[in-house]
């Protein structure tokens, strides 16, 4: 195997004692914005990637695992609850890849992406076309540079799905308020009857799952149904959790044939086939392992503005 002559290691810590290292071969953009530290770079093995505050958000090699898992289970849930995903709100999502996945749905008439950091959005638009694939220019898409909490307070309850594609909820970062009970109540009030909400919900590895269990437990104090699930993408160094929430029931054993039929009816074939999500994959994702089920059941902490997520 050929090793580049010039590179340096980008280290990402998961605990004070554990980190992963990824080789950076070229820096495409670096800056400290008003909200966070941003790096867009070419890596040795995983293509281009976005790093915020020292944490990888996505790389071109495996971002499809994350973005398909974030978007399509939620929109399938809307259909299964008797709705049609016409209006979708994305919170965060600077790379434009979440936007890309939403725009696969032919029923979508309007998708608004709200991100607090316009500098990061513009850098991703310039340097990560492999991720957004021109989605920012789609006439159905609108990008709003604003605080998601403020935007939600002003919007009407018109949304069929709200997708939270935010950086990790650390108190020093811009997103920690968006993982609290107060915020989840705001989200619920802005959804249509058959609407669904999905959130990136932290790592689910055995020594890191406390944040995930608290997010899921907090959601359960607000929504009638919550389905946790997780993916493994090498960029993140371990399993990463999500939580899907709705007022209608969410089947933990979705019928693969029905899911495949929904996807076939609603996805635009001109935008290419999904690489990760299908009926069998969704069924597998929803089978939460025993240790995680027990940890969620035992969780008692509720994230609030008075008791927000913190680094532990």
From Swiss-Prot:
Binding locations of S-methyl-5'-thioadenosine: 36, 115, 147-148, 174
Reactions listed under catalytic activity: S-adenosyl 3-(methylsulfanyl)propylamine + putrescine = S-methyl-5'-thioadenosine + spermidine + H(+)
Xref: InterPro entries: PABS, SAM-dependent_MTases_sf, Spermi_synthase, Spermidine_synt_N, Spermidine_synt_N_sf
One GO cellular component, as annotated: cytoplasm
Domain PABS: 7-247
EC annotation from Swiss-Prot or TrEMBL: 2.5.1.16
Gene3D superfamilies in the record: Spermidine synthase, tetramerisation domain, Vaccinia Virus protein VP39
Annotated positions binding spermidine: 67, 95
Protein name per UniProt: Polyamine aminopropyltransferase
Organism: Synechococcus sp. (strain JA-3-3Ab)
Gene from which this protein is expressed: speE
């Amino acid at each position: 195997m050929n090793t580049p002559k010039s590179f340096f290691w980008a280290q990402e810590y998961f605990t004070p004692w554990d980190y992963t290292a990824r080789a950076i071969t070229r820096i495409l953009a670096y800056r400290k914005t008003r909200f966070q530290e941003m790096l867009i770079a070419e890596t040795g093995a995983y293509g281009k990637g976005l790093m915020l505050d020292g944490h990888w958000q996505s790389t071109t090699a495996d971002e499809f695992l994350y973005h398909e898992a974030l978007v399509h289970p939620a929109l399938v849930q809307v259909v299964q609850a008797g709705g049609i995903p016409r209006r979708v709100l994305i919170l965060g999502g600077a790379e434009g890849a979440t936007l890309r996945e939403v725009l696969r749905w032919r029923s979508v008439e309007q998708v608004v992406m709200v991100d607090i950091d316009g500098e990061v959005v513009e850098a991703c638009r310039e340097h990560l076309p492999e991720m957004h694939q021109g989605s920012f220019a789609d006439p159905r898409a609108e990008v709003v540079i604003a605080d998601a909490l403020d935007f939600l307070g002003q919007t009407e309850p018109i949304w069929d799905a709200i997708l939270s594609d935010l950086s990790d909820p650390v108190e020093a970062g811009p997103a920690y308020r968006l993982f609290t009970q107060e915020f989840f109540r705001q989200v619920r009030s802005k959804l249509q009857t058959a609407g669904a909400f999905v959130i990136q919900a932290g790592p689910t590895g055995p020594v890191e799952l406390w944040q995930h269990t608290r997010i899921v437990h907090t959601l359960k104090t607000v929504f009638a149904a919550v389905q946790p699930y997780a993916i493994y993408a090498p960029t993140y160094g371990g399993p990463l959790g999500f939580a899907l929430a709705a007022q209608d029931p969410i089947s933990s054993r979705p019928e693969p044939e029905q899911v495949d039929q929904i996807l076939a009816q609603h996805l635009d074939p001109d935008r290419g086939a999904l690489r990760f999500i299908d009926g069998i994959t969704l069924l597998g994702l929803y089978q939460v392992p025993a240790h995680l089920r027990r940890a969620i059941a035992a969780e008692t902490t509720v994230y609030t503005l008075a008791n927000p997520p913190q680094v532990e």
